[in-house]
Amino acid sequence: MEIITEKELATAIKLDKLKMPGLASFLMEVMKLNEINHVFASNMHIEGLPFIDAILEHIGVKIEIDEAELKNIPKDGAFIAVANHPFGGIEGLLLLKVICSQRSEFKLMANFLLNKIPNLKEYFIPVNPFETVRSVSSIGGMKLAMETLRDGIPLGIFPAGEVSTFKTSEQRITDKQWSPVVG
């Protein structure tokens, strides 16, 4: 099973309109999406937070958590965790792992494509980072995020909506402008 196919990638980033055969395949390789599909297939039998642990172990990521810092996470009530997103999905997995260790009901606003990971679907509120906040593909996610907070459930947000990129004009890696909804 694949998390994302060439066709889905092409549609999501509007490559399908360019009529350039092979470009989606090339991007799947360059963006390591084929590797992600392989790692998922190897761990698809694991559910929930143990799935995150298996993925992190599979890709060789270790995390050290200061137990004293975990005490800063409110034990009840809604809050919003805001994080940068420099590398991609890894930040989402780590944020889920850390916050859910204290608040198992935590939800994360995430790219709608991540909803294809059935092992973690319960944790995601899908939005489309390739569209504006007012786009039909994001309105449902925004409503669900507001309901989540009203219900006292904590929510994680990556306000840039996409991974950081290298800006040649600034000679550094930067986030895209944050969504005005967050900051």
Feature-to-residue mapping (PLM):
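Soluble catalytic domains of membrane acyltransferases
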Residues: 62-183
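Membrane-anchoring hydrophobic helices of lipid-metabolizing enzymes
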Residues: 1-82, 92-94, 101-103, 121-122
